[in-house]
Amino acid sequence: MNKHALIIGASGVIGSNLATHLLAQGWKVTGVSRGRTPVPAGCVSLQLDATDAAAVASGLAGIDASHVFFTAWARQENEKENIRVNGAMVANVLAALGQNGHAGHLRHAALVTGLKHYLGPFDAYGKGSVPVTPFREEQGRQDVENFYYEQEDRLFEAAEKYGFSWSVHRPHTIIGYALGNAMNMGLTLAVYANLCKANGQPFVFPGSSAQWNGLSDMTDAGQIARQLAWAADSPAAANQDFNIVNGDVFRWKWLWPRLAAYFGVEAAELPDTISPLAERMDGAAEQWRAIAAQHNLVEADVSRLASWWHTDADLGRPMEVMTDMSKSRKAGFLDYQDTPEAFFTLFDRLKAERVIPL
């Protein structure tokens, strides 16, 4: 049976890695983006604002997708706006595909959210009753406003109406190759380390003592791509929610010196108070332009590489955050990715692509 994937957010860190993975498996892939960053080679590119219902209906007319993957979100000023805008993205796309879905074309829709399902949104960390780690799918929703819940509800509603199966995927922080992405810790830390090296400064952990000392895990973009592909046609994954992480655990106080050693910078001890990157990177734009010119790098705009705010938010959490993968494994997804290796593989590629200095 032919497989045609429609990927919403195909130029992002998850969407681009998913597109590459599906293309290698022989899928037809249509990649939806706003056009600021190219989609992977081999994708049919569709520039579209998924928040615009009329544009979505027009742009997706005639698209006979068998599977749709939601891998993007649009950050707004507050959670009410996050709910309105990001819920509409899911609703608009599924409504536009609905008639095709009712006719039997659309078989499955996958939604990528994240661990804020358990923690609450960025501006409400810890306001609900945060579950005990490791987070498990049956722990359910927090009693706070959260755009993830709105997206899920729109997904469930459309699946019941049009008769396709669904899956929800909850990664931890993503490591993967993508430029111009709003949430990319691996690239952010690579840029930060190179700025430290250029300035002769130590590599200071920008987060909390809870994150430094507690157990943690992460999600490689290739790992979630493989789970999304597996869930697309696996009966055991139909109408299920799954956590998705690499499968190992670590402590930042163990990993941080290893990242520093890769870049040849000094790993500082944990400071007495949190030292957010956003407060220390005022001069980063000018400094990065100089580094890019000196090393002939492909991107001189640091804002397209580093997401200081997102890395601060993840590493500044006041609690331990880690995830249980038992449900996914019991259902048949057994893939594993070594986390330090994921970082170093990403850093090697960033050097090879001239994103960071050799």
Residue ranges of predicted features:
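N-terminal Rossmann NAD(P)H-binding glycine-rich loop of SDR-like oxidoreductase domains
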Residues: 3-25
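NAD(P)H-binding glycine-rich loop region in Rossmannoid oxidoreductase-like domains
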Residues: 37-40, 44-92
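Conserved Rossmann-fold NAD(P)-dependent oxidoreductase catalytic core, especially the SDR/UDP-sugar
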Residues: 68, 88-147
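Flexible, glycine-rich beta-alpha linker
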Residues: 118-120, 143, 164-197, 205
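Active-site Tyr-X1-5-Lys
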Residues: 139-172
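Glycine/proline-rich active-site loop of Rossmann-fold NAD(P)-dependent oxidoreductases
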Residues: 162, 176-192, 222, 230-242, ...
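A conserved pocket-lining segment of Rossmann-fold NAD(P)-dependent short-chain dehydrogenase/reductase
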Residues: 191-219
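Mid/C-terminal beta-alpha module of Rossmann-like enzyme folds, strongest
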Residues: 224-311, 316, 324-326, 330, ...
